[in-house]
């Protein structure tokens, strides 16, 4: 083999080796460039991230500062509200205490007022009772004086049988039988206007006379319950010495029927004073006239005229209260 050929064969591996080295160098340069680029990118990313973090930190710091201020302000407001709430609670407690005090005072005043009203009512009731008793006593005294005067006149020969027109005489008393719808008190006023009073009945004979002449539908009479002692008293102040109650009567002590009517049968029945009846009976003492001189019998009253034998009638027995 020739020498030239041997040199070419030897040169061939050397060329290949140089070509590989060049490729390795180029690869290293490319790799270095890539790493440099990557590092640059990392540095840029780090710088950008650092800036962002700084901005976030600054923003967070500002937010924290603002939040702290807000918290401080809120805490101050909260403390002020708490103080105000405490003050309001104290004022509310004071108001409640004042309300309770006023309530106690109001209750005490109510008790005192009720006591005063009860005392006033008791005083008025007592005064009314005393006034009624005094009025009844005065009326009874007047009645007694009138009866005594009549007894004296009768003993002196006076004739006591004169009655006003439309009045009927019976045993030295005059009776008026009124007609018209009235309550008990208005019937009493009607009798007062005629200088009389609602009738008081003291004997069976008087009761028979009234039963004969009174209305058959019922009439008011002068008996009533004043609620002083739970007993009935005549309007002239006299007590009940004769009674003619219907069976089961009276019932006013429990039902408030404080006035008395006379039924058509003559029996008595207690009734509500505001009940309206169509009749009532008044009475008054008859007027006495002096005795007529002998021979003037015509001037004497009808009960004083001589009988067919020429004798004067015996005077009626005196009335007793």
Curated annotation (Swiss-Prot):
It comes from Homo sapiens. Glycans are attached at residues 63, 296. Residues 66-85, 290-321 are annotated as: Disordered. Residues 1-21 are cytoplasmic. This is Low affinity immunoglobulin epsilon Fc receptor. Residues 162-284 form the C-type lectin domain. GO terms for molecular function: carbohydrate binding; IgE binding; integrin binding; low-affinity IgE receptor activity; metal ion binding; pattern recognition receptor activity; protease binding. The lineage of its organism: Eukaryota, Metazoa, Chordata, Craniata, Vertebrata. The keyword Metal-binding applies. Disulfide bonds join 160-288, 163-174, 191-282, 259-273. One of its GO terms (cellular component) is extracellular exosome. Ca(2+) binds at residues 249, 251, 269-270. One of its GO terms (biological process) is positive regulation of gene expression. Detected in urine (at protein level). Low-affinity receptor for immunoglobulin E (IgE) and CR2/CD21. Has essential roles in the regulation of IgE production and in the differentiation of B cells. On B cells, initiates IgE-dependent antigen uptake and presentation to T cells. On macrophages, upon IgE binding and antigen cross-linking induces intracellular killing of parasites through activation of L-Arginine-nitric oxide pathway. The record marks 149-150 as: Cleavage. There are two kinds of Fc receptors for IgE, which differ in both structure and function: high affinity receptors on basophils and mast cells and low affinity receptors on lymphocytes and monocytes. The keyword Calcium applies. A lipid is attached at residues 17-18 (S-palmitoyl cysteine). SUPFAM superfamilies: C-type lectin-like. It is a single-pass type II membrane protein; Lipid-anchor.
